[in-house]
Structures are given as C-alpha cells and as structure tokens.
C-alpha cells in the first residue's frame, strides 16, 4: 500500500535466487546468494516460453548432457531482469516429455540450471517494451554449453523447484497488486473529495457518484 514497488525488487530477486536457496549446492549458494542479499548481483528466473507460456510441462527448451557439460537449446520469454541479470535460473528438459492419455505432456524430466551472460550460445534475442519497473527480454540458447556444476539440484527436479519458488513469490506479487488497488482507490476518493469545480466538489457530481 505504501511502497508497492519494493515488492518488485523483492520478487524479481527472490524468483531468480530462490531455486539456489531451495536446491542449490553449497558452493553455488555461497557464490551467489550473499551477493544477491547485498545488492551486488541481479538474478533472473527463466521459465516461460513463447509457445508454452506458463504451461511448464509444455516447455520445449532442452539441455543435453555431454561429458562434463550440458548443451542448452531453446528460448525463454517475458523474463524479468532479462539483459541486466548477473545470472539466470533457466529451466529446460533433460529428458523427453512423457505424453498422458489425453495428449498433454507431463512435467517430469525438467531440470534447472544457472546460466551467466557471458556463456557462449546465450543471447538476449529481444528486449520487450512494457510498462514495468524492470526490463523484460526474450532469451535464446543455441548450443549453449555450461558446466555440469551449474545444475541446480538433481536432474528431473526442475518442475518441483519452479513450483516451490512460485508458491513463495506469487503470494507477494498478489499482495502488492491488492495494495496498489487499495491505494489507487483511496487516492481517487481523496482527489474527488478535495477537487473543486463549478462551485462543488468533484465527489458531488452524479457521474462521479455513479
């Protein structure tokens, strides 16, 4: 209500770093979490895709295990902090989707990884214009190779990690939205009661009251 924009910083940093808090190894947490907490690193959460949206089970991005590396291919979009983040928590399939009888894909076989801006094969494909306090971008991965040490948790745990992360921060985003709405209503009422025109207050006009 008083500073809804504070939640944007909390939620964006939290979304990007929570997978590390929940499932990252000790070395991974030690490398990134203190920097995020101190405001010295920006995190991003890369889950949504152009064709799948927020339907996580339908994601098409893949990560193929190749010796001591994973090779990522695919796209992510509407990624908050895209283009300015110091690291990205990226979700991709490490095994093909299993089809249910109704034809839908199961969420099994999804894994999570840390990707850094300088990784070869990783590019910011598009900067998305939007009315937002943070940048949005489409990310592209073309044979992007990252060390196996950048796997968050174990293979196949990505869906659970993503849902546990969203369980935390969807709540705070919803609370911020409610706070914005309450503040907007209160500001509108205050203005209507104090704005004079044509010899009356704005609140006294029938159109305002209706």
Residue ranges and their predicted role:
Residues 46-49, 91-94, 126:
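Short beta-strand segments that buttress and anchor functional surface loops
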Residues 112, 122-210:
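Glycine-rich beta->alpha junctions and the first turn(s) of the following alpha-helix
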Residues 1-30, 34-40, 81-87:
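Internal helix-loop-helix
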Residues 23-26, 66-68, 93-97, 117-120, ...:
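Short loop segments at secondary-structure junctions
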Residues 69, 73-123:
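A short core secondary-structure module
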Residues 61-64:
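A structural signal for short hydrophobic beta-strand segments in well-ordered beta-sheet cores
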